[in-house]
């Protein structure tokens, strides 16, 4: 392929430049996207499957090369390896944006790789990666139903900003990443400072105008330079197969839908599928293959569930479209934790635990912008027993990381300032039962665990997951969706926030986008559900507890002059190690001179403060100190008046009477009251015990 390029101007100093034909020419599609000095490369390749499967084997991997920012990893291994949390989250953004664009029953193994090759420290690479991955697929042979693009939207100084820079984003009240086609939204994810539903809709509409502009440019470029699409890899569903399967299960599945609990419904559905396979699969007839019959069964189930909702307004568990499942709350739940809550909504349950600690408990991370530490972090655990299965236990999967980060963002906006509450906060959400909306249960349970731990949050936060049934030109929004509704429905729209406004949201679409009107309806219905849940939460725990748990460490802060930081640390950290050893407290010093002292007892904190004040305190001429004799010489004694500060009390200043033998007057280690007479130009202290004696 010859070298080709095109550009899309978004705003001043924000122009997307797409290039192909120079790099990775053996890939099915390869694109280099540039904005200023941030460059992101994306490739798309596909391979034929050795055997047909009933899912789309689509994999996205995004990697930020440290060399792109002129850095190397601070770890022992300098080669990029296991993806970081941020890389996994961006990989998920790309995957969720692109997945709805593929045709149903596409029998290809598809891989998209994205690498950050150059990073200027200003232009954020994730929206470039979404656009680059989409463009790489667009010019490849991989079949797609639509072209997509992605952007980031911020709210800075009351104005919407497209693809905000890193500095703009730090001042923004909104961080929204969204993707869609030229006419509809496919994916959104973001968090914000208590924006209203109307503001979020306005932000989405603002971003959609730029998405349409990018999509139109990619589509025009595809028509001019793209490869022929390989639609032969898409399997058709024979109409008679779908009809036969639908007729076979109609009455039987209607009976299965009468079961209101998840386990009974799943068992009935499993038995029905086995019956369908046993009766309808025909080895001699390829139309009635196992793959086709299973796909037709899934479609028939979905259609029947949808019909129940559309015709009767009743869902599979008997609820109306706006009804929330029964909620029970127990807090505190665990006796020795700093804060805990058992939050149950229907058959979804989260055991949330809050742990408070000092600076050493912060979550360290490393990315293109350097090293950092998270003051607050939420970790989500989804063991296989929560859905009655046997499975792998180990490092978290992409889904666990994504769900945890969404809940973390939802709660981060209500945390107090560090100056008011200096603790490091770790939240964990242990999903002990799951039937949909477990990430939003993590938000609710996590909020209550924070309140139980005595974290003075600004307001309670609740979350709810919304679904969509879109058929017959009719859009039905479902509140608090269950697992089967998530699986067979058209949308998963999670919204979290306070009574005042939204703090986080995430939407995934399985169809080719939804309209502004549907999102408006979903957000309005989500607000009603959120208010209901918040009311139940505040009935159990109206406000955060006034004090932290007796099992939590005590933390106090003190401020010192930045010029004294080196004094407190000492050569090679000697001084601060001595403070920690002598006090039993954990001491952490920030670059701004703020010192955090954490200990299990108040006595340890007081001892550490005393030692630090001694090191950083300034001696005053004329002041009397109760010092300690550190050494004795023939001409006088050296007395430590403050930790690390010694002065000389000459033999003539020891007493009003003549002292012949100093050792007869005072011993090393004795306490001795001395008055500071003067400080010479070298900083040496002249002390007098005689001056403290009464006439």
Swiss-Prot record:
This protein's encoding gene: pnp
Role, per record: Involved in mRNA degradation. Catalyzes the phosphorolysis of single-stranded polyribonucleotides processively in the 3'- to 5'-direction.
SUPFAM superfamilies per the UniProt record, alphabetical: Eukaryotic type KH-domain (KH-domain type I), Nucleic acid-binding proteins, Polynucleotide phosphorylase/guanosine pentaphosphate synthase (PNPase/GPSI), domain 3, Ribonuclease PH domain 2-like, Ribosomal protein S5 domain 2-like
Protein's UniProt name: Polyribonucleotide nucleotidyltransferase
SMART domains, sorted: KH, S1
GO aspect biological process, one term: RNA processing
Gene Ontology MF term list: 3'-5'-RNA exonuclease activity; magnesium ion binding; polyribonucleotide nucleotidyltransferase activity; RNA binding
Cofactor section: Mg(2+)
Primary localization: cytoplasm
Binding positions for Mg(2+) per the UniProt entry: 486, 492
This protein's UniProt keywords: Cytoplasm, Magnesium, Metal-binding, Nucleotidyltransferase, RNA-binding, Transferase
Pfam families for this protein: KH_1, PNPase, RNase_PH, RNase_PH_C, S1
Keyword Cytoplasm: yes
Bridged cysteine pairs (disulfide): none
PANTHER family: POLYRIBONUCLEOTIDE NUCLEOTIDYLTRANSFERASE, POLYRIBONUCLEOTIDE NUCLEOTIDYLTRANSFERASE 1, MITOCHONDRIAL
One GO CC term, this protein: cytosol
Subcellular location: Cytoplasm
Species, as recorded: Chlamydia trachomatis serovar A (strain ATCC VR-571B / DSM 19440 / HAR-13)
InterPro entries registered for this protein in UniProt: ExoRNase_PH_dom1, ExoRNase_PH_dom2, ExoRNase_PH_dom2_sf, KH_dom, KH_dom_type_1, KH_dom_type_1_sf, NA-bd_OB-fold, PNPase
């Amino acid at each position: 392929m010859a070298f080709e390029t095109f550009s899309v101007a978004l705003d001043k100093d924000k122009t997307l430049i797409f290039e192909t034909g120079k790099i990775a020419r053996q890939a099915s599609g390869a694109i280099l996207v540039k904005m200023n000095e941030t460059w992101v490369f994306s490739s798309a390749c596909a391979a034929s499957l050795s055997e047909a499967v009933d899912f789309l084997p689509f994999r996205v991997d995004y990697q930020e090369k440290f060399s792109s920012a002129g850095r190397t990893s601070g770890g022992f291994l300098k080669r990029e390896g296991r993806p970081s949390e941020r890389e996994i989250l961006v990989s998920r953004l790309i995957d969720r944006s692109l997945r709805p664009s593929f045709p149903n029953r596409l029998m290809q193994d598809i891989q998209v790789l994205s690498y950050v090759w150059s990073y200027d420290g200003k232009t954020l690479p994730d929206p470039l990666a979404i656009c680059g991955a989409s463009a790489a697929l667009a010019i490849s042979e991989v079949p797609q139903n639509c072209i997509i693009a992605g952007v980031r939207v911020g709210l800075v100084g009351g104005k919407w900003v497209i693809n905000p820079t890193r500095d703009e984003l730090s001042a923004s009240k909104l961080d929204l990443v969204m993707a869609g086609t030229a006419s509809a939204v496919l994916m959104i994810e973001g968090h914000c400072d208590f924006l209203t539903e109307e503001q979020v809709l306005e932000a989405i509409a603002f971003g959609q105008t730029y998405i349409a502009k990018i999509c139109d440019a990619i589509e025009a470029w595809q028509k001019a330079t793209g490869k022929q699409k390989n639609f032969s890899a898409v399997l058709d569903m024979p109409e008679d197969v779908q009809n036969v399967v639908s007729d076979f299960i109609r009455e039987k599945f209607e009976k299965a839908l009468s079961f209101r609990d998840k386990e009974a419904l799943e068992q009935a559905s499993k038995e029905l599928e086995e019956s369908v396979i046993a009766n309808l699969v025909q080895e001699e007839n390829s139309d009635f293959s196992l793959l086709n019959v299973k796909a037709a069964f899934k479609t028939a189930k979905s259609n029947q569930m949808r019909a129940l909702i559309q015709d009767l307004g009743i869902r599979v568990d008997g609820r109306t479209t706006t009804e929330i499942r029964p909620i029970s709350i127990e807090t505190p739940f665990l006796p020795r934790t700093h804060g805990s809550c058992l939050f149950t909504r229907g058959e979804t349950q989260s055991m949330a635990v809050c742990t408070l600690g000092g600076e050493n408990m912060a979550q360290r991370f490393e990315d293109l912008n350097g090293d950092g530490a998270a003051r607050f972090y939420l970790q989500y655990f989804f063991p296989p027993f929560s859905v009655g299965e046997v499975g792998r236990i180990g490092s978290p999967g992409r889904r666990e990381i994504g769900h945890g980060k969404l809940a973390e963002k939802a709660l981060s906006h209500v945390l107090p300032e560090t100056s008011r509450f200096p603790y490091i906060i770790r939240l964990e959400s242990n999903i002990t039962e799951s039937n949909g909306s477990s990430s939003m249960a993590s938000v609710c349970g996590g909020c209550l665990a924070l309140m139980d731990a005595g974290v003075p949050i600004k307001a309670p936060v609740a979350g709810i997951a919304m679904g969509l049934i879109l058929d017959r030109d009719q859009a039905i929004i479902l509140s608090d969706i269950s697992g089967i509704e998530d699986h067979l429905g058209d949308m998963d729209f999670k919204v979290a926030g306070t009574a005042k406004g939204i703090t986080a949201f995430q939407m995934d679409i399985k169809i080719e986008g939804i309209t502004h009107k549907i999102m408006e309806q979903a957000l309005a219905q989500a607000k009603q559900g959120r208010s209901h849940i918040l009311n139940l939460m505040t009935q159990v725990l109206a406000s955060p507890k006034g004090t932290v748990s007796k099992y939590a460490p005590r933390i106090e802060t003190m401020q010192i002059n930045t010029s004294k930081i080196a004094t407190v640390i000492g050569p090679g950290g000697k001084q601060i190690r001595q403070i920690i050893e002598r006090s039993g407290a954990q001491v952490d010093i920030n670059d701004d001179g703020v010192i955090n002292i954490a200990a299990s007892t108040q006595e340890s904190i007081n001892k550490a403060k005393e030692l630090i004040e001694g090191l950083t305190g300034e001696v005053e001429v004329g002041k009397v100190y109760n010092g300690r004799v550190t050494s004795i010489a023939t001409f006088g004694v050296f007395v430590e008046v403050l930790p690390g500060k010694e002065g000389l009390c000459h033999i003539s200043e020891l007493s009003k009477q003549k002292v012949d033998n100093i050792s007869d007057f005072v011993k090393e280690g004795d306490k001795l009251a001395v008055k500071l007479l003067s400080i010479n130009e070298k900083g040496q202290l002249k002390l007098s015990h005689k001056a403290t004696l009464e006439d």
